[in-house]
Every structure is written in structure tokens, then in C-alpha cells.
Amino acid sequence: MTMDSNTFEIKNCLCCWYDLLGYGAPFVNSKWDLHNGQCKENFERIEQLRLLFTTSLAVKPLGTRLTFNDGFASTIDVDPITPETFYETLLFLEGALHDFESINVEDQRRNFPGARGVITFGQRFSYDHCNSSYDLLSERTVSYHPAEFQMNTAFSKAFIMEESGSRAGIAGSHLYIDIDVYHHIARAANQIGCKIPTIKVEDDVLVLEIFGPKGWFATLQFDSAPIIYGENSNYKNRGIETTLYKYKYMHSVIDDLANEAAYQQSLRYSMMEEESDSE
């Protein structure tokens, strides 16, 4: 029996998966006994990152996050392509990059190795629109199945690629972005009449300029050397064939607005202090 995909609602989406590095070693060394003192380090580590795991810039305004163990995924639907949803997609991407940077800064400040992540593009199909199941007799939730992560191929691909690690050239506490993310942004920008993203290479740095409905949105920098992910004897690609780029830096219009807001706030405090001193 064959199924016609047109009878199902399949949505395009972006998804990121971030995973703490070195988190499994204490569990392995303790034989997976949480009472073992070696696990205390992991408890303290995840507790310090708790707020960064459970709150996110990427989930505003419309993204959704799924957190478990030492990793989390954030996803957003990118259909239908309109100026509004395109801008929300850019906000999600900008927030996801800042989320990754925040986790790495905080984790490495405490001499931990940080996180590794992948952002990719895919589709999702929700087979159950109820996010959880509640048993009235026992008065408890008996299952969780968030619609946004049901059959989410972007989530699956990000998880698989990140898990491949250094065997696939995805090494260290870095973030890697699938070229399919760029392809979607370029396609969507063209469809709604925005300026197409521009790419140039300066020395060993690939510079990507992204534009939104109101003009320039962000400048992203990557290592110019591509990472070809596909069939390879060193790892199982699970049918994924794409190209990744290692993220280095971002400057966005949101950064400028935040800096301006901080500057204005500092001026207010300064003026208040001057008025207080003059009284």
C-alpha cells in the first residue's frame, strides 16, 4: 500500500541540536550510578546551565524547544513563506546562534569543554496534535509527544550529524550550519522580494550577508572550508548528504538595537545621578 504525501500536512522547518561535550564520561566512570560522587560534577554543570537550557532567544516569537539530558533542540516552522514568517525565521536563526554562544561562554568559564551543535533544514509531520496524554485515574501525565518534534527530519538530521563528531569533521565546541539553511533563506527571500543573501570569501573566512523585509539583518562569518557530509567509512551518514560550514561570528541588527538600548539606559542613569548630585 502506498501513501500519497499530498494527503498529509508536511511542513518545512529549521531545527538546531546542541549537546554538551564530555558529559557522558563521569557517568561511564561511575557505572551509571547517580549516587557515585563522580556524577556530582555533572549535576553542578547542568544546574549552572539550567536557565540557558530552559529559556531561549530562539523560541521567541514562535520557536519550540525540547530539552532532555545534556542537550536540547529548538525548531520553527518556516511555512508559509510570507514577509512575516521570513522575518520570524531570521529571528529564530539569530536567537539560536546567540543561544549557542551563551552556553559555550558560560560552560567554558567554569573550565568545561562547552557544547557542539548543528542547525539544519528539513520537514516535519505531526501524527498527533495532542502534546501529551493524561490519565484521569492516576491523575498524571503518562506520555509526552510534542507536535513540533513528531517525525521532524530536521531534528533527526541535526542529531545524527552532531553525533558523528570528529569522524565527520564536526569537532570541538563549535556550531555547524547546513547549507540547506542558506538555500531556504535565499529561496524565501527571492519569493517575497527581499534582497538575496550575498556571499564573499575574505582570506579563510566566508562572509554571509542576510537581508530581511526592512533591509540588512545580519552578517555571519564561517570557516571557508566546507565540510562534506555523506557516505563515508568512518561514520554512518544515514542517508544524509549535504555540506556544513563551521560558524565563527555574527553581527545583527538586533545586536545594534540592544547596544543602542543599553546606551540609552546608561544615559538615563547618568542623568539621574547628575540630577541627584545637583539637589
PLM features: residue spans?
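Catalytic core of nucleotidyl cyclases, primarily class III adenylyl/guanylyl cyclases
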Residues: 56-84, 104-152
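Amphipathic alpha-helical regulatory segments at dimerization interfaces
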Residues: 52, 99-106, 160, 164
